Every structure is written in structure tokens, then in C-alpha cells.
From Swiss-Prot:
Function of the protein: NDH shuttles electrons from NAD(P)H:plastoquinone, via FMN and iron-sulfur (Fe-S) centers, to quinones in the photosynthetic chain and possibly in a chloroplast respiratory chain. The immediate electron acceptor for the enzyme in this species is believed to be plastoquinone. Couples the redox reaction to proton translocation, and thus conserves the redox energy in a proton gradient.
Annotated protein name in UniProt: NAD(P)H-quinone oxidoreductase subunit 5, chloroplastic
Membrane topology annotation: Multi-pass membrane protein
Organism of this sequence: Arabis hirsuta (Hairy rock-cress)
Entry's EC annotation: 7.1.1.-
Subcellular compartments: Plastid, Chloroplast thylakoid membrane
One MF term in the entry's GO annotations: NADH dehydrogenase (ubiquinone) activity
Gene3D superfamilies: 1.20.5.2700
Regions crossing the membrane: 9-29, 40-60, 89-109, 125-145, 147-167, 185-205, 221-241, 258-278, 280-300, 327-347, 354-374, 396-416, 425-445, 547-567, 602-622, 720-740
Broad class of enzyme this protein falls into: translocase
């Protein structure tokens, strides 16, 4: 056992040869390196698989032998200061390593096909290999200096991957936005590290926790300064894990390739912030005010992310805001002191969200064959619809991921989210109300994404898209907003069934279009003609096996990974592997908990949360299920007429929510107005002052000296008469000055 741990330090460096060799090869032997592109893919997957097996072995050992292993080497800089570096292996490290490697391997397999058409294929795999190395180095670090080093490498890799298509202005701006936003968090993290070192004199986690505890117990530390340092440490995870108010970079990060969106949102960059808070929880837990701040930031992010996801039309941006909300749940759990629940949700969410992003990538890949390689079209859910019969495997995988994120049993996220919701009841009634309400919103917006994408009929070829519905048959907009047109009070099923089948009614316009005499009529949503050839209809097709295989593996994870934390221990049933792994575990809300509940208590706890999720799904189904395929919508439409007295207030509320969501809560606009524009204005003024004033003075003195020299040289000219003239001039000037003064 000890012999095995002696080689744990090599975990971060196993994937490193691939990016190094790719970089050298592309510089020195570009043709040969590009011809061997599949070899580099296989090598990347093979090396990451070795890390996964090693991490899995360590986790199995830790389940049966609860231990923490640390190995540190010291580098003496002088007699007063020495830098220690090493590796730290505990259950958190093992779990994170497994998470990073499993998701990373599947994303690499997926990327082999998804990125095959891209000229930067090898550059992408080099970045991915370095990204995995940086994240593995972060989770195995034994001290804050190593954490900060790999923390910066993770940020650099995300910058490179978000801006992978840097020749396009939008991705270039997105990666700069992510980089600058994370610099704010990184600066706070650095200040916090330096402040803690000033207090404790150590960077090592174990020493740090012990020294801080002793200082607080003996009242030998300034609590205000310690709280400030702890908060500065927390600023880093706020930015990295896209917590309010430093979340603004996350939706723009969707401008990168879809595989990297899956990796960032599942197991790397955003998970890094949650990991660091979990690692430093023994420090935060002795400072109650910091724990409350963590939970407050978490609950704000939970609600904000959910509300911002409501009106998104880009499928990846909708999933990005979903990630933001779920990260808020994890941060809330950590702030409440529910260590196990937070990490459990980190695990289940990682696999579910990776499945959803890879599923969205498969959808986008299929849509690109029709609308072209334009994110504004291929990622727009308005142009989708009716994909069930075209991409059935992708649809099934996406549905499972959606149900999991909604918290529907027995899928993965149900088990972890329900624990967090139950803990919120014990922590604060207000926080519990927000957390439970957001669970309903999550179910609503996730099923909205699913229904807009897969139900109905393909909307790509339809004309005159205006974003509004004026048909008297359909009064719900694409995000669920009721329009102002009046409905026929006596509208029923018979007129619908007797409509002319050779015509179709636009959901957005009153004009009708004849489809074909040979094609069965179907009711469509009309959308703008983007210059496509509408005479020949092409339909999306299912993706290749190398894209589907990772999705199916993630589907299995989504189905079964929740079993590792099922809190049942009755009649010989003992599923709770996670509690064994995290023994002893920090839990401020269940200090005397036995880490299991019986069936009756479990059913009591989950009934309410599942009911809220089902209600959210029901509302989404009512508003987004295609009109012609659901009799329920007829009842809904006829009921709108009865709401005339309340429609004005209802529409104002709907418009407010829509504008809030569509404009990203006005937070981006606030930052742009108060920070970005002012900084740019200051930069322009500074540039003007530097060039016109500072450089003007310097250049002016130089030019003046030059002309004075030239004039002097001309006047002198090696002629005696000129010298006499200058001499007499100086004498006269001197006498004049002397006479007056």
C-alpha cells in the first residue's frame, strides 16, 4: 500500500507528454505530426486511462482503509524560508481524479469525431491534454502555493480553449472576458494565501488547519483579519465556479468547441472552485461569518442561474446557466457545512451535465448539415424541433440527462439534490423556500429545452420568423409568454380536425403556405429564411458511433452513479459507499447522523421535492408541447379567455421575467456601463496623456535642442566675425540685465 502511494506524485504528469510532443512536433515536424493525428488521440486516451485506473485503485483502498497520505519535499531558499512541495492523497483527491479522468476520456473520444473537420485538431488535443494535467495537479496539491500554480494553469487552458477559434471576434472576446473575470478572483486568492501565510507561517493544508484552530482557541489571532483572508480565499472559487457576481464569463464560454464546454462544465474549471472550497472547509468552518457568506452566495447563484436560463434560445447557453444554478446548490451545501451532499452533487451533476452537453453537441453537429457552420443557427432552439425521429439515440440520452437534472428518481441528480434540499430546511427556512422553488424552475427550463429541441416538427425551413405568434390557435411564445391576441371562446376539437389538410397555419404569422399535394400537412412554426435552398429538404441525421458511444456511457453513469450515495442501510442493504469514503465527514447539520435513513423517512423527504419538479415539468409541457399533438393545450388556450381581468398583470410579470432573463439580469450591462466603459475611457485618456503630454515634453525638448544646435552651428560657421558677434551679443545682454537689476 505504501509502495503504491510513493508513485502518486506522477498522476498529474502522465498525460503531459502528449501536449509537449505535439507542441514540439507541430513546430519542427508539422507534416509528419499531422499525418499521425489519430495516434496522438489514441495516446491521449491511453495515458488518461492509466490515471483513471490508478485513481480507481486508490479509491477502492480508501473505502476499506480510511487514511490520508501526504508526501512533501523541502526546497530551502535560505535559512529563514523554505518552499515545500509534494502531493496529498485523500478521498477528495481520489474522487476528483476519477471524475476528471472518466469525463476526460469520454470527451476525448467524442472530440475525435466532433473536431475531425477542424484544422486545429491537433492543437485542440494538445490543449485538452494540458488542461487535464493542470486539473490533476490541482487536486493532488499538498499546499496553497501548488494550488495557485495549477489554478493559474487551469485558467490559462480555459482561455486557450474558449478562444480556440480566435480568428472569429466573438470567441476572441469571450476568452478575454473569461480571462479578465477570473483574474479578479485569482488576485483575491493570492492575497488570501499571502495573508494566511503571514498569520500561520505555513502553506501546507494540514499545518494550516491545525495552526488556525490553535490560534482561535487560544485567542491569539485577529479574527477580523483572519475573516478577511478567508473571504479573499473564497473570491477565487467565486470566479472559477461562476458564482454571483463573477459569473458573467460562463455563458460566453460557450463560444468554444462543444467538447470543451462539456469538460469545463462537468469536471474541470468550474469544479475547481467547488474543490478548493471543499479542501479549505476545515478552515472556513471555524469562521461562522464566512460559512454564512458562502451559503448566501450559493443561494443567490442558485436562483439567479435558474431565472437567467428561462428565456435562452441558444441550447448551450441554456445549459450553461443551468450549470451556474447547480454549482450554486453545491456552494450552498458547503456553506451549510454539508460536505458529503456537496461532493455527491458534484459527482452526479458532472456526469449528467457532460451527457447533456455532448448531447447538445450531437444535435448541433446534425443541424450544421442543414443550416451551416454558424452558432447563431445551429445552436438556436427555435430552428430545431421534431428531432425525435431523426436522432432517436441522442434524444433518449438527452431526455435521461434532463430528467436527472430535474431531480426525477431514480436518476443520479435526484439523490444528491434531494439531500441538499433537505439540509436547507434545517439551515434556514428562507434558503429552503428559494432552493425548493428553484428546483421547480430547473425542471421547467430543462424541459423547455427538451421540448423545443425534440418535440413538434423541424422549424429550419420556415419563413418569416418574427419571434411572436399572431395565430389565433397558439398564444404561447417560444419561452412560454402569452401574447395579446384574443382567442375564440368556442374553439373546440372538431374545427381543428376538419381544417384543410393542404394548408398550414403559421404560429407566428397569419399568412398560409401550401406545402405539397404529396406531403401530409403538419403544423409548423415559421422562421426566417436564412438564404437556404427550401426546394430540397434535408433533415438531421444521427451522429456517428464515436459520438454516440461516450453519450451512452455517460447515460449509464447517469442511471447508476447515484447508487454510491443512497442513504439506505436496512435489512442488510448497504449502498452508501460515499459515506464510507468520506469517513469521518464534516456535517454541521447532522452531527449525530448515522449516514442512513429508513424507507419511510426517505419517502417523506422526497415527496415534496419530486412533486415540485413534476409541477415544473407539467407547466413546461403545457406551454411548449406542440399544439396539434396535445388536447391539454386546447383546455389551456380556452382558459386564457377567462383570465381577461388578470391578463394585464400577468403579462407585465411575464414581460419582466422575460426581459430579466433575456438581458442576463442586467448584470452584464451594469458591468459594461460602470466598469468596462469607464476603464476604456480612462485607458484612452491615459494613452492621450502619455503620447501627447509625456512624450510631447520629451520629444519637444529633443527637437528644441536639435534646432538650437543647428542654429548655433550655422551662426558659428568657423568665422571670426560670427564669434565676435556672439561675444558682443552676450556682453550686451549681460550689461542690460545688470543695468535693470
Amino acid at each position: 500500500m505504501e509502495h503504491t502511494h510513493q508513485y502518486s506524485w506522477i498522476i498529474p504528469f502522465i498525460p503531459l507528454p502528449v501536449p509537449i510532443l505535439l507542441g514540439v512536433g507541430l513546430l519542427l515536424f508539422p507534416t509528419v505530426t499531422k499525418n499521425l493525428r489519430r495516434m496522438w488521440t489514441f495516446l491521449s486516451i491511453f495515458l488518461l486511462s492509466i490515471v483513471m485506473i490508478f485513481s480507481l485503485y486508490l479509491s477502492i483502498q480508501q473505502i476499506f482503509l480510511s487514511y490520508i497520505h501526504q508526501n512533501v519535499w523541502s526546497w530551502a531558499i535560505n535559512n529563514e524560508f523554505s518552499f515545500e512541495f509534494g502531493y496529498f492523497i485523500d478521498p477528495l483527491t481520489s474522487i476528483m481524479s476519477i471524475l476528471i479522468t472518466t469525463v476526460g476520456i469520454l470527451v476525448l473520444i467524442y472530440s475525435d469525431n466532433n473536431m475531425s473537420h477542424d484544422q486545429g485538431y491537433l492543437r485542440f488535443f494538445a490543449y485538452m491534454g494540458f488542461f487535464n494535467t493542470s486539473m490533476l495537479g490541482l487536486v493532488t496539491s499538498s499546499n496553497l502555493i501548488q494550488v495557485y500554480f495549477f489554478w493559474e494553469l487551469v485558467g490559462m487552458c480555459s482561455y486557450l480553449l474558449i478562444g480556440f477559434w480566435f480568428t472569429r471576434p466573438i470567441p476572441a472576446n469571450a476568452c478575454q472576458k473569461a480571462f479578465v473575470t477570473n483574474r479578479v478572483g485569482d488576485f483575491g486568492l493570492l492575497l488570501g494565501i499571502l495573508g494566511l501565510y503571514w498569520i500561520t507561517g505555513s502553506f501546507e493544508f494540514q499545518d494550516l488547519f491545525e495552526i488556525v484552530n490553535n490560534l482561535i482557541l487560544n485567542n491569539r489571532v485577529n479574527l477580523l483579519f483572519l475573516t478577511l483572508c478567508a473571504f479573499l480565499l473564497f473570491v477565487g472559487p467565486i470566479a472559477k465556479s461562476a458564482q454571483f457576481p463573477l459569473h458573467v464569463w460562463l455563458p460566453d464560454a460557450m463560444e468554444g468547441p462543444t467538447p470543451i464546454s462539456a469538460l469545463i462544465h462537468a469536471a474541470t474549471m468550474v469544479a475547481a472552485g467547488i474543490f478548493l472550497v471543499a479542501r479549505l472547509l476545515p478552515l472556513f468552518i471555524v469562521i461562522p461569518s464566512i460559512m454564512y457568506i458562502i451559503s448566501l452566495i450559493g443561494i443567490i447563484t442558485v436562483l439567479l442561474g435558474a431565472t437567467l436560463a428561462l428565456a435562452q434560445k441558444d441550447i448551450k447557453r441554456g445549459l450553461a446557466y443551468s450549470t451556474m444554478s447547480q454549482l450554486g446548490y453545491m456552494m450552498l451545501a458547503l456553506g451549510m457545512g454539508s460536505y458529503r451532499s456537496a461532493l455527491f452533487h458534484l459527482i452526479t451533476h458532472a456526469y449528467s451535465k457532460a451527457l447533456l452537453f455532448l448531447g447538445s453537441g450531437s444535435i448541433i453537429h446534425s443541424m450544421e448539415a442543414i443550416v451551416g457552420y454558424s452558432p447563431d443557427k445551429s445552436q438556436n432552439m427555435i430552428l430545431m424541433g421534431g428531432l425525435t425521429k431523426h436522432v432517436p439515440i441522442t434524444k433518449t440520452a438527452f431526455l435521461v440527462g434532463t430528467l436527472s437534472l430535474c431531480g426525477i428518481p431514480p436518476l443520479a441528480c435526484f439523490w444528491s439534490k434531494d439531500e441538499i434540499l433537505n439540509d436547507s430546511l434545517l439551515f434556514s427556512p428562507i434558503f429552503a423556500i428559494i432552493a425548493y422553488s428553484t428546483a421547480g424552475l430547473t425542471a421547467f427550463y430543462m424541459f423547455r429545452i427538451y421540448l423545443l429541441t425534440f418535440e413538434g416538427h423541424l422549424n429550419t425551413y420556415f419563413l418569416n420568423y418574427s419571434g411572436k405568434k399572431s395565430s389565433s390557435f397558439y398564444s404561447i411564445s417560444l419561452w412560454g409568454k402569452e401574447e395579446e391576441q384574443k382567442l375564440n371562446r368556442n374553439f373546440g376539437l372538431v374545427p381543428l380536425l376538419t381544417m384543410n389538410n393542404t394548408k398550414r397555419v403559421s404560429f407566428f404569422g397569419k399568412k398560409t403556405y401550401k406545402i405539397s399535394n404529396n406531403v401530409t400537412n403538419q403544423t409548423f412554426i415559421t422562421v426566417e429564411n436564412f438564404g437556404l435552398n427550401t426546394r430540397t429538404f434535408y433533415y438531421p441525421h444521427e451522429s456517428d458511433n464515436t459520438i454516440l458511444f461516450p453519450m451512452l456511457v455517460l447515460l449509464l453513469f447517469t442511471l447508476f452513479v447515484g447508487t454510491i450515495g443512497i442513504p439506505f442501510n436496512q435489512e442488510g442493504i448497504d449502498f452508501d459507499i460515499l459515506s464510507k469514503l468520506f469517513t469521518p465527514s464534516i456535517n454541521l447539520l447532522h452531527k449525530n447522523s448515522q449516514n442512513f435513513v429508513d424507507w419511510y423517512e426517505f419517502l417523506q423527504n422526497v415527496t415534496f421535492s419530486v412533486s415540485i419538479a413534476l409541477f415544473g415539468i407539467f407547466i413546461a409541457y403545457c406551454l411548449y408541447k406542440p399544439f396539434y399533438s396535445s388536447l391539454l393545450n386546447l383546455t389551456l388556450l380556452n382558459s386564457f379567455k377567462k383570465w381577461n381581468s388578470k391578463r394585464i398583470g400577468w403579462e407585465k410579470l411575464i414581460n419582466f421575467v422575460y426581459n430579466w432573463s433575456y438581458n442576463r439580469g442586467y448584470i452584464d450591462a451594469f458591468f459594461k456601463t460602470s466598469l468596462t466603459e469607464n476603464i476604456r475611457r480612462l485607458a484612452k485618456q491615459t494613452n492621450f496623456f502619455d503620447k501627447q503630454i509625456i512624450d510631447g515634453i520629451t520629444n519637444g525638448l529633443g527637437i528644441t535642442s536639435f534646432f538650437v544646435g543647428e542654429v548655433t552651428k550655422y551662426i558659428g560657421g568657423s568665422r571670426i566675425s560670427s564669434y565676435l558677434f556672439l561675444y558682443l551679443s552676450y556682453v550686451l545682454i549681460f550689461l542690460r540685465i545688470l543695468f535693470y537689476f
